[in-house]
Design a protein with these regions (language model features):
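N-terminal cap/lid segment of alpha/beta-hydrolase-fold proteins
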Residues: 35-82
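Short beta-strand element of the alpha/beta-hydrolase
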Residues: 83-92
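The serine-hydrolase catalytic nucleophile loop
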Residues: 94-106, 120
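Conserved alpha/beta-hydrolase
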Residues: 107-127
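Alpha/beta-hydrolase active-site loop
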Residues: 133-154
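Alpha/beta-hydrolase-fold enzymes
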Residues: 174-256
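Short beta-strand/loop motif that positions the catalytic acidic residue
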Residues: 292, 298-300
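Catalytic histidine-centered segment of alpha/beta-hydrolase-like enzymes
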Residues: 330-339
Length: 354
């Protein structure tokens, strides 16, 4: 009997897969699913937390992800015309496109890129039920669905598409870059690894016993929610600004004040579904970060409580086209609006989306 090698095993697996496909072809015909957007109610007025630019054109657009969920986005396009490099932007975790992601997108459009800022599935103006739930799989797919949309626009060069994720969507962006070879450049700004923080707590303070108790509590909540016929919200930020911890006060300063409050933002209001964290606990986002071949830029604030997420993610990345930039004096939310290093981000995308 001949010894199996990795090559023969791969060939065997491929043969088995093709055999299954052939068997399926002989069975009763099944019509392929069509991509059908659901009707969304989109606002017509400018309701962002930042001023509208006179240098770019703006319009509302929609696209559909691989799970059939229709996503809503703001498109920002330079008024110069021509074929553009394009960037899809989303985040922070619990925010909407009218907040930080829209500011990133509009500013990068002023610098020559066609951009979209989208609401993730189940949030903002995007579709999907139940509302206010997060998923490491579906929300990673949201980025790839944005690439689907951009790659099929006549004014976008499909070989020049990048993505930018803020806060929790920074980790999603890295996961998308590991899976989607069409993505040529990725920026993760002030990133969270949502799998890590949900499974281990802040600063990895949660042990196995703590995880067990958390799972127990969340699964009991599932039963209660099902009995009640509705999903309980975890609650957003407190009504009054907390004295500590400082990073929660920083969040409050953005989401609960005129600086960043928005009526559709989960963080500005009732928060996520309580059980949303369950899927993140057992599904690590950065498993294949070391296999990302395209360019990656990690940006984080020097004084951010979350800085360790970017520093540890950077250790996983391989290749000379990966970089980590620490913004002096910046905390986590400073990179939502106040201290975003747009020159650095522009130079990165200009270099790798040629």
């Amino acid at each position: 009997m001949a010894l199996s090698t990795p090559e023969t095993l791969c060939k065997a697996a491929l043969t088995a897969s093709l055999s299954l496909c052939a068997a399926g072809a002989l069975a009763a015909p099944v019509e392929p699913s069509s991509i059908e957007p659901e009707p969304l109610k989109l606002t017509a007025e400018w309701d962002k937390v930042f001023a509208q630019s006179n240098w770019v054109a703006h319009e509302k657009i929609t696209f559909v992800n691989r799970y059939g969920i229709t996503l809503a986005a703001d498109l920002y396009k330079p008024k110069t015309g021509g074929s553009f490099a394009a960037i899809a932007v989303s985040g922070p975790f619990g925010a909407v496109k009218e907040q930080s992601s829209g500011l990133y997108a509009q500013t990068l459009a002023e610098r020559g890129f066609l951009t979209i800022a989208f609401d993730p599935s189940f949030t903002g103006e995007s579709g999907g039920k139940p509302r206010y739930v997060a998923s490491p799989d579906i929300n990673t797919e949201d980025f790839s669905a944005a690439v689907d949309y951009l790659a099929t626009r006549g004014d976008v060069n499909p070989e020049r598409i990048g993505i930018l994720g803020i806060c929790g969507w920074g980790g999603m962006a890295l996961n998308a870059a590991a899976a989607d070879t069409r993505i040529k450049a990725t920026v993760a700004s002030t990133m969270y690894d949502m799998s890590r923080v949900n499974a281990r707590g802040y600063f990895d303070a949660m042990n196995e016993e703590g995880r067990y108790e958390l799972r127990k509590t969340l699964n009991e909540r599932r039963t209660l929610d099902y009995k009640a016929g509705r999903y309980t919200l975890a609650g957003g930020l407190p009504d009054e600004r907390p004295a500590e911890p400082q990073f929660v006060a920083d969040y409050w300063d953005y989401y609960k004040t005129e600086r960043g409050y928005h009526k559709r933002s989960l963080n500005s209001n009732g928060g996520w579904n309580t059980t949303s964290s369950l899927s993140f606990i057992n599904m690590p986002l950065l498993t294949y970060a070391g296999e990302i071949r395209s360019a990656v830029l990690l940006v984080h604030g020097e004084k951010a409580h979350s800085r360790y997420f970017s520093e540890d993610a950077f250790k996983l990345l391989k290749g000379e086209n990966k970089s980590l930039v620490i913004v002096p004096g910046a905390n986590h939310t400073d990179l939502y609006d106040k201290k975003i290093p747009f020159d650095t981000i522009e130079n990165f995308f200009s270099t790798y989306l040629k």
